[in-house]
C-alpha cells in the first residue's frame, strides 16, 4: 500500500476458463480491500499488495489442471514476485497452478473414485501463522465448500514428511476426506508462509445468505491485518 488511508489492492488473475474470479472479487471487497483485475496475458503487477489465483478450469484444464496456465505471462511475472515475498493465495485451480509453477510442492490429481465433489467441508486450521490464516486459531475447525474433480493432493514421501515437520500443512480435511488427498491435506504453504494453496473455496463462505457461514472471510482479512504492513512503503 502506498498511502495509509488507501485500501489494500489485491490482484485477482483471470485465465480463460476461470469461474470464481468475480466471487473472489466480492470476497476481497467484503474484507475491506480493493480487488484489481489481472489478465492472464499481461505481466504488470505494479500497485498490487497481494495476488489471488481463483478457481475454475484455466485453459480448459487441458494436459493437466493448471499445466498451461503456468506458462502465461502473468504467472511468469508472479514467480519472481512470489519469491521476493508477495503474498499469493491459490484457490482450487489456483492451487494447481501454484504447484505446476513450482511455487508449492506436490501435485493435485484425480479424486479417488473419479467423481466431481461439491459439498460443504469441515476443515481444521493447522498453520495459523501464514499470510492468509493469521485470523484463525490453531486447531480451529471451520466449514468451507469444496468443488473439484482433481483435488487429490499427492507428493513424494520425503516432501510430505517435510511439510508435516515444518508445520506447512495449512488446513486438513476433517470428518471425511473428499478426494483421497495424502494425510487429509487440504492446503499447504511455502517455507516463508506467504504463499498458500488450498482446494476449498473460502470465497464461497463469506456471507451467511449464500454460503455455509462466514468462515472463509478471515482468509481475506488475515492478509490485510498482518502481512501487508510489511509491504507498505
From Swiss-Prot:
Task: Write the record's keywords in alphabetical order, separated by commas.
Answer: ATP-binding, Cytoplasm, Glutamine amidotransferase, Hydrolase, Ligase, Nucleotide-binding, Purine biosynthesis
* Annotated ranges, domain Glutamine amidotransferase type-1: 9-233
EC numbers, comma separated: 6.3.5.3, 3.5.1.2
**Which residues does the Swiss-Prot or TrEMBL record annotate as the active site?**
92 (nucleophile), 201, 203
Give one GO term, molecular function aspect. phosphoribosylformylglycinamidine synthase activity
What pathway annotation does it carry? Purine metabolism; IMP biosynthesis via de novo pathway; 5-amino-1-(5-phospho-D-ribosyl)imidazole from N(2)-formyl-N(1)-(5-phospho-D-ribosyl)glycinamide: step 1/2
Report the locations given in the UniProt record. Cytoplasm
InterPro entries associated with the record:
Class_I_gatase-like, PRibForGlyAmidine_synth_PurQ
GO biological process: any one? Answer: 'de novo' IMP biosynthetic process
Q: Which PROSITE patterns match?
A: GATASE_TYPE_1 (PS51273)
Q: Does the keyword Repeat apply?
A: no
One GO location term (cellular component): cytoplasm
Mind telling me which NCBIfam families this protein's record contains? Answer: FGAM_synth_I, PRK03619.1
Protein function: Part of the phosphoribosylformylglycinamidine synthase complex involved in the purines biosynthetic pathway. Catalyzes the ATP-dependent conversion of formylglycinamide ribonucleotide (FGAR) and glutamine to yield formylglycinamidine ribonucleotide (FGAM) and glutamate. The FGAM synthase complex is composed of three subunits. PurQ produces an ammonia molecule by converting glutamine to glutamate. PurL transfers the ammonia molecule to FGAR to form FGAM in an ATP-dependent manner.
What is the name listed in the Swiss-Prot or TrEMBL entry for this protein?
Phosphoribosylformylglycinamidine synthase subunit PurQ
Q: Which organism is it from?
A: Frankia casuarinae (strain DSM 45818 / CECT 9043 / HFP020203 / CcI3)
Gene label: purQ
Amino acid at each position: 500500500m502506498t498511502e495509509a488511508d488507501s485500501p489494500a489492492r489485491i490482484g485477482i488473475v483471470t485465465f480463460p476458463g476461470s469461474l470464481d474470479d468475480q466471487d473472489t472479487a466480492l470476497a476481497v471487497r467484503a474484507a475491506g480491500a480493493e480487488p484489481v483485475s489481472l489478465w492472464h496475458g499481461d505481466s504488470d503487477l505494479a500497485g498490487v499488495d497481494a495476488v489471488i489465483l481463483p478457481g475454475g478450469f484455466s485453459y480448459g484444464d487441458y494436459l493437466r489442471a493448471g499445466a498451461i496456465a503456468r506458462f502465461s505471462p502473468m504467472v511468469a511475472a508472479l514467480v519472481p514476485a512470489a519469491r521476493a515475498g508477495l503474498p499469493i493465495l491459490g484457490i482450487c485451480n489456483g492451487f494447481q497452478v501454484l504447484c505446476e509453477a513450482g511455487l508449492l510442492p506436490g501435485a493435485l490429481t484425480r479424486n479417488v473414485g473419479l467423481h466431481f465433489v461439491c459439498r460443504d467441508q469441515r476443515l481444521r486450521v493447522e498453520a495459523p501463522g501464514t499470510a492468509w490464516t493469521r485470523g484463525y486459531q490453531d486447531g480451529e475447525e471451520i466449514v468451507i465448500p469444496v468443488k473439484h474433480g482433481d483435488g487429490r493432493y499427492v507428493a513424494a514421501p520425503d516432501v510430505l514428511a517435510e511439510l508435516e515437520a515444518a508445520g506447512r500443512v495449512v488446513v486438513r480435511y476433517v470428518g471425511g476426506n473428499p478426494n483421497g488427498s495424502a494425510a487429509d491435506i487440504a492446503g499447504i504453504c511455502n517455507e516463508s508462509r506467504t504463499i498458500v494453496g488450498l482446494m476449498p473455496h473460502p470465497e464461497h463462505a463469506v456471507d451467511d445468505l449464500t454460503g455455509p457461514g462466514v468462515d472463509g472471510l478471515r482468509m481475506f482479512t488475515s492478509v490485510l491485518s498482518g502481512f501487508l504492513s510489511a509491504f507498505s512503503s
